[in-house]
C-alpha cells in the first residue's frame, strides 16, 4: 500500500494545491474505488489548507482524533469498509477533484477541522503516541485493502508532520526554486537523512516561473538541485527521485489562476477549457501520479 506525505520545509511552496490536483490522477493510476479507496488526511492542524479547499467536507472523525488514537480506528467492526466505524465517518471527495459520481467514494477525507473544540495537539500529547496512532491507521487501511494513505503535512519540523514522514514509504518534497527554499530543503534532508529509512523522496520544484529575461540558467539550477538533494541523502537508505526535473521536465509550472484562488484543474475543465499554463501543469500532475503509483499498482 502506498503511504505518501506531501511535505515542504517552508510554507508557501504550493504543497496543498499540488496534492489537491494530483489526487484524481493518482486515483486513476491506482484504480481506486469505493471498496479500495485512497484515504487522505489533512495533518496541517494549524493552517488546515486542504480542509479549507474542501468546504463543507468536515469528516465525522478529524485528524486530531486520528493522531490521538480514536477508538474507532482500532475496531474491527465489519468486513465491509463502508460500514466500518472509522471509514464510514470519512467524507467522500472524488467528485470534488473531478472524478465521476460513481467514484466519489474512491477518495475519503479526514479533515483537520475539530468538531469538539480541540484545535491543536496539547501539552500532554507526545511523539511516540502520535506515531503509534498513525501506525494503527496504516494497519487498518492495509487490512481493509485501501489503495493508499495520502497525508498533507505542515511545513517544517512540527509533530504531526514528522509523524507522517516516518510512516510514509514515499515523500513528495515540494519546493519553490528560490535560494531560501533550496537551502532550507537541503538542510532539512541532511538532518533527517538517518532518521528516515528506506524512503523514496520525490523532489518537486513547484510553481516554477518563466525564466525569460531573468539571466538565470534553468538547466544549471535544476542540475544544482539534483546534485545537492542527492548529496543531502548520501550514506542513507533513502532514494531520491528527480524525474520531475530531468529528461526535459521543468518541475510544475506556475499556474496564473493559483495566484488568486487555488482550485482543482481537472474539476475546472468540466466548466471551461483549460489555458496553456493549466494544461502544462496537468501533464506534470499526471507524471507525479505515475511516479507515486509506480510499484504500488
Walk through the language-model features, giving the residues of each.
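P-loop/Walker A phosphate-binding loop and immediately adjacent motor/lid segment at beta-alpha junctions
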Residues: 121-138, 185-213
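Conserved beta-strand segments of the P-loop GTPase G domain that flank and frequently precede/overlap
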Residues: 6, 41, 110-112, 150, ...
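Inter-motif core of Ras-like GTPase G domains
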Residues: 158-179
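Walker A/P-loop phosphate-binding motif and the immediately C-terminal alpha-helix
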Residues: 2-47
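C-terminal lobe/tail of nucleotide-utilizing enzymes
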Residues: 194, 198-297
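P-loop/Walker-type NTP enzyme "switch/lid" segment
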Residues: 45-142
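Active-site signature of alpha/beta-hydrolase-fold catalytic machinery across serine-
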Residues: 21, 25, 52-53, 163
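Conserved nucleotide-binding/hydrolysis micro-motifs of P-loop NTPases
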Residues: 45-47, 114-117, 155-157, 178-180, ...
Amino acid at each position: 500500500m502506498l503511504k505518501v506525505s506531501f511535505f515542504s520545509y517552508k510554507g508557501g511552496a504550493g504543497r496543498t494545491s499540488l496534492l489537491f490536483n494530483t489526487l484524481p490522477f493518482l486515483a486513476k493510476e491506482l484504480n481506486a474505488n469505493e471498496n479500495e479507496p485512497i484515504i487522505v488526511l489533512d495533518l496541517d492542524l494549524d493552517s488546515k489548507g486542504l480542509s479549507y479547499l474542501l468546504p463543507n467536507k468536515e469528516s465525522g472523525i478529524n485528524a486530531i482524533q486520528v493522531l490521538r488514537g480514536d477508538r474507532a480506528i482500532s475496531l474491527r467492526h465489519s468486513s465491509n469498509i463502508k460500514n466500518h466505524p472509522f471509514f464510514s465517518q470519512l467524507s467522500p471527495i472524488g467528485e470534488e477533484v473531478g472524478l465521476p459520481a460513481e467514484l466519489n467514494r474512491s477518495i475519503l477525507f479526514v479533515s483537520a477541522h475539530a468538531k469538539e473544540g480541540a484545535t491543536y495537539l496539547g501539552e500532554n500529547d507526545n511523539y511516540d503516541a502520535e506515531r503509534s496512532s498513525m501506525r494503527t491507521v496504516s494497519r487498518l487501511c492495509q487490512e481493509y485493502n485501501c489503495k493508499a494513505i495520502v497525508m498533507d503535512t505542515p511545513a517544517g519540523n512540527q509533530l504531526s508532520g514528522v509523524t507522517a514522514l516516518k510512516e510514509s514509504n514515499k515523500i513528495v518534497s515540494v519546493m519553490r526554486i528560490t535560494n531560501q527554499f533550496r537551502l532550507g530543503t537541503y538542510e532539512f534532508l541532511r538532518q533527517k537523512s538517518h532518521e528516515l529509512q528506506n524512503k523514496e523522496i520525490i523532489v518537486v520544484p513547484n510553481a516554477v516561473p518563466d525564466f525569460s529575461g531573468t539571466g538565470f540558467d534553468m538547466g544549471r539550477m535544476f542540475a544544482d538541485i539534483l546534485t545537492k538533494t542527492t548529496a543531502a541523502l548520501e550514506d542513507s537508505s533513502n532514494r531520491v527521485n528527480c524525474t520531475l526535473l530531468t529528461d526535459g521536465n521543468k518541475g510544475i509550472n506556475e499556474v496564473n489562476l493559483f495566484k488568486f484562488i487555488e482550485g482543482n484543474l481537472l474539476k475546472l475543465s468540466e466548466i471551461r477549457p483549460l489555458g496553456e499554463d493549466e494544461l502544462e501543469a496537468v501533464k506534470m500532475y499526471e507524471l507525479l501520479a505515475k511516479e507515486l503509483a509506480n510499484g504500488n499498482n
